[in-house]
Amino acid sequence: MLYTLCLARNNPYTNTEMAHRPNEIGKGWDLVFSEETFAQYGVKWVVYCDATWSNEEYAVFAINTYKDIPARLAHWKEIEKAAWYQYIDLLTLMGTSDQEPQLPTFPNPIFQLFMIRNDPATAANLARETKEEEAARWAKWEESYKRVGARSVLYCDSYWANEDYLGFGVLAFPSVEARQAHAKDLLEMHWNQYYSAFTLLGIPRA
Protein backbone atom coordinates (compact mmCIF):
# COMPACT_ATOMS: atom_id res chain seq x y z
CA MET A 1 0.00 0.00 0.00
CA LEU A 2 1.24 3.52 -0.84
CA TYR A 3 1.60 6.19 1.85
CA THR A 4 2.58 9.85 1.76
CA LEU A 5 4.09 11.68 4.72
CA CYS A 6 3.60 15.46 4.78
CA LEU A 7 5.60 17.55 7.24
CA ALA A 8 4.57 21.24 7.32
CA ARG A 9 7.17 23.78 8.41
CA ASN A 10 6.42 26.97 10.31
CA ASN A 11 7.45 29.39 7.56
CA PRO A 12 6.88 33.14 8.18
CA TYR A 13 6.17 33.80 4.49
CA THR A 14 3.60 31.04 4.00
CA ASN A 15 2.08 31.74 7.43
CA THR A 16 1.57 35.38 6.35
CA GLU A 17 0.02 34.30 3.06
CA MET A 18 -2.40 32.07 4.96
CA ALA A 19 -3.35 34.88 7.35
CA HIS A 20 -3.99 37.36 4.52
CA ARG A 21 -5.97 34.99 2.27
CA PRO A 22 -8.34 32.99 4.46
CA ASN A 23 -10.99 32.64 1.74
CA GLU A 24 -8.51 31.30 -0.80
CA ILE A 25 -7.11 28.90 1.80
CA GLY A 26 -10.60 27.62 2.52
CA LYS A 27 -11.34 27.07 -1.16
CA GLY A 28 -7.98 25.36 -1.67
CA TRP A 29 -8.57 23.08 1.30
CA ASP A 30 -11.98 22.08 -0.03
CA LEU A 31 -10.51 21.38 -3.46
CA VAL A 32 -7.59 19.32 -2.18
CA PHE A 33 -8.77 17.70 1.06
CA SER A 34 -12.56 17.47 0.92
CA GLU A 35 -14.29 14.13 1.47
CA GLU A 36 -15.36 14.19 -2.18
CA THR A 37 -11.77 14.66 -3.40
CA PHE A 38 -10.46 11.96 -1.10
CA ALA A 39 -13.15 9.56 -2.29
CA GLN A 40 -12.37 10.37 -5.93
CA TYR A 41 -8.67 9.52 -5.58
CA GLY A 42 -8.95 6.83 -2.91
CA VAL A 43 -7.15 8.89 -0.26
CA LYS A 44 -7.49 8.28 3.48
CA TRP A 45 -5.98 9.96 6.54
CA VAL A 46 -3.87 7.72 8.78
CA VAL A 47 -2.73 10.39 11.24
CA TYR A 48 -3.04 14.19 11.21
CA CYS A 49 -1.22 15.80 14.13
CA ASP A 50 -0.37 19.21 15.58
CA ALA A 51 3.35 19.42 16.37
CA THR A 52 4.10 23.08 17.18
CA TRP A 53 3.63 22.45 20.91
CA SER A 54 6.66 20.13 20.87
CA ASN A 55 8.83 21.70 18.15
CA GLU A 56 8.10 25.20 16.86
CA GLU A 57 9.98 24.59 13.61
CA TYR A 58 7.15 22.33 12.45
CA ALA A 59 3.40 22.94 12.58
CA VAL A 60 1.81 19.69 11.45
CA PHE A 61 2.62 16.19 10.27
CA ALA A 62 0.21 13.90 8.48
CA ILE A 63 0.24 10.55 6.70
CA ASN A 64 -2.21 9.65 3.94
CA THR A 65 -2.75 6.37 2.17
CA TYR A 66 -3.40 6.06 -1.58
CA LYS A 67 -4.70 3.10 -3.53
CA ASP A 68 -1.83 3.40 -6.08
CA ILE A 69 0.70 5.73 -7.75
CA PRO A 70 -1.75 6.98 -10.45
CA ALA A 71 -4.12 8.08 -7.67
CA ARG A 72 -1.29 10.00 -5.99
CA LEU A 73 -0.32 11.66 -9.28
CA ALA A 74 -3.92 12.68 -9.99
CA HIS A 75 -4.36 14.12 -6.48
CA TRP A 76 -1.03 15.96 -6.76
CA LYS A 77 -2.33 17.70 -9.90
CA GLU A 78 -5.27 18.98 -7.86
CA ILE A 79 -2.84 20.21 -5.20
CA GLU A 80 -0.88 22.14 -7.85
CA LYS A 81 -4.10 23.51 -9.34
CA ALA A 82 -5.00 24.94 -5.93
CA ALA A 83 -1.57 26.68 -5.77
CA TRP A 84 -1.22 24.99 -2.39
CA TYR A 85 2.56 25.50 -2.21
CA GLN A 86 2.04 29.27 -1.96
CA TYR A 87 0.55 28.70 1.48
CA ILE A 88 2.22 25.59 2.88
CA ASP A 89 5.96 24.82 3.17
CA LEU A 90 6.10 21.03 3.01
CA LEU A 91 8.53 18.15 3.14
CA THR A 92 6.89 15.04 1.67
CA LEU A 93 8.01 11.42 1.48
CA MET A 94 6.39 8.46 -0.22
CA GLY A 95 6.64 4.97 1.18
CA THR A 96 5.08 1.53 0.98
CA SER A 97 3.99 -0.98 3.59
CA ASP A 98 2.41 -4.43 3.47
CA GLN A 99 0.62 -3.82 6.77
CA GLU A 100 -2.53 -1.87 7.56
CA PRO A 101 -2.11 0.99 10.07
CA GLN A 102 -2.86 0.00 13.67
CA LEU A 103 -4.22 3.03 15.51
CA PRO A 104 -4.07 2.94 19.33
CA THR A 105 -7.19 2.28 21.38
CA PHE A 106 -6.04 4.23 24.45
CA PRO A 107 -7.29 7.83 24.89
CA ASN A 108 -5.28 10.99 24.11
CA PRO A 109 -2.32 9.33 22.39
CA ILE A 110 1.01 11.05 21.87
CA PHE A 111 2.18 10.22 18.35
CA GLN A 112 5.86 10.09 17.49
CA LEU A 113 6.82 10.50 13.86
CA PHE A 114 10.21 9.04 12.97
CA MET A 115 12.17 9.31 9.73
CA ILE A 116 15.23 7.05 9.45
CA ARG A 117 18.11 8.71 7.62
CA ASN A 118 20.42 6.91 5.20
CA ASP A 119 23.58 7.41 7.28
CA PRO A 120 26.87 5.68 6.31
CA ALA A 121 28.13 5.61 9.93
CA THR A 122 25.08 3.84 11.34
CA ALA A 123 24.96 1.55 8.30
CA ALA A 124 28.55 0.50 9.04
CA ASN A 125 27.66 -0.27 12.67
CA LEU A 126 24.71 -2.38 11.56
CA ALA A 127 26.90 -4.26 9.09
CA ARG A 128 29.38 -5.19 11.86
CA GLU A 129 26.64 -6.49 14.14
CA THR A 130 26.11 -10.26 14.31
CA LYS A 131 22.62 -11.72 13.96
CA GLU A 132 22.70 -12.67 17.65
CA GLU A 133 23.62 -9.11 18.67
CA GLU A 134 20.90 -7.68 16.47
CA ALA A 135 18.29 -10.03 17.94
CA ALA A 136 19.36 -9.15 21.49
CA ARG A 137 19.22 -5.43 20.76
CA TRP A 138 15.71 -5.65 19.29
CA ALA A 139 14.57 -7.79 22.22
CA LYS A 140 15.59 -4.97 24.58
CA TRP A 141 13.76 -2.46 22.38
CA GLU A 142 10.64 -4.64 22.42
CA GLU A 143 10.77 -5.00 26.20
CA SER A 144 10.95 -1.23 26.67
CA TYR A 145 8.25 -0.61 24.07
CA LYS A 146 5.83 -2.99 25.78
CA ARG A 147 6.68 -1.83 29.30
CA VAL A 148 5.75 1.79 28.56
CA GLY A 149 2.55 0.75 26.74
CA ALA A 150 3.56 2.00 23.28
CA ARG A 151 1.95 0.88 20.02
CA SER A 152 3.37 0.72 16.50
CA VAL A 153 0.98 2.49 14.12
CA LEU A 154 2.84 2.16 10.82
CA TYR A 155 6.24 1.71 9.20
CA CYS A 156 6.93 2.42 5.52
CA ASP A 157 9.94 1.73 3.30
CA SER A 158 10.84 4.95 1.47
CA TYR A 159 14.37 4.37 0.12
CA TRP A 160 12.95 3.57 -3.33
CA ALA A 161 11.40 7.06 -3.51
CA ASN A 162 13.97 9.20 -1.64
CA GLU A 163 17.46 7.87 -0.92
CA ASP A 164 18.00 10.37 1.91
CA TYR A 165 15.60 8.33 4.04
CA LEU A 166 15.33 4.57 4.50
CA GLY A 167 11.85 4.70 5.97
CA PHE A 168 9.34 6.53 8.11
CA GLY A 169 6.71 5.56 10.60
CA VAL A 170 4.64 6.44 13.63
CA LEU A 171 4.58 5.13 17.20
CA ALA A 172 1.85 5.93 19.73
CA PHE A 173 2.47 6.47 23.44
CA PRO A 174 -0.14 6.73 26.21
CA SER A 175 1.60 9.79 27.70
CA VAL A 176 4.61 12.07 27.36
CA GLU A 177 6.09 10.30 30.39
CA ALA A 178 5.89 6.98 28.53
CA ARG A 179 7.78 8.48 25.60
CA GLN A 180 10.40 9.92 27.97
CA ALA A 181 10.90 6.51 29.58
CA HIS A 182 11.32 4.83 26.19
CA ALA A 183 13.78 7.51 25.06
CA LYS A 184 15.84 6.96 28.24
CA ASP A 185 15.97 3.24 27.50
CA LEU A 186 17.12 3.92 23.92
CA LEU A 187 19.96 6.13 25.16
CA GLU A 188 21.09 3.44 27.58
CA MET A 189 21.04 0.95 24.69
CA HIS A 190 23.14 3.35 22.54
CA TRP A 191 20.40 3.11 19.92
CA ASN A 192 21.74 6.17 18.08
CA GLN A 193 24.82 4.15 17.11
CA TYR A 194 22.58 2.05 14.86
CA TYR A 195 19.96 4.49 13.57
CA SER A 196 20.08 8.16 12.69
CA ALA A 197 16.54 9.51 12.82
CA PHE A 198 14.51 12.69 12.79
CA THR A 199 11.63 12.44 15.27
CA LEU A 200 8.71 14.69 16.12
CA LEU A 201 5.89 14.47 18.66
CA GLY A 202 2.30 15.35 17.79
CA ILE A 203 -1.23 15.14 19.10
CA PRO A 204 -4.28 14.35 16.95
CA ARG A 205 -5.72 17.49 15.40
CA ALA A 206 -9.36 17.94 16.36
Regions found by a protein language model. Give the residues of each.
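C-terminal structured interaction module
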Residues: 196-197
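Accessory, usually C-terminal, subdomains that scaffold auxiliary metal cofactors
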Residues: 192-193
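Short S/T/G/P-rich N-terminal loop/turn motif that feeds into the first structured element of a domain
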Residues: 1-58, 63-77, 84-166, 172-184, ...
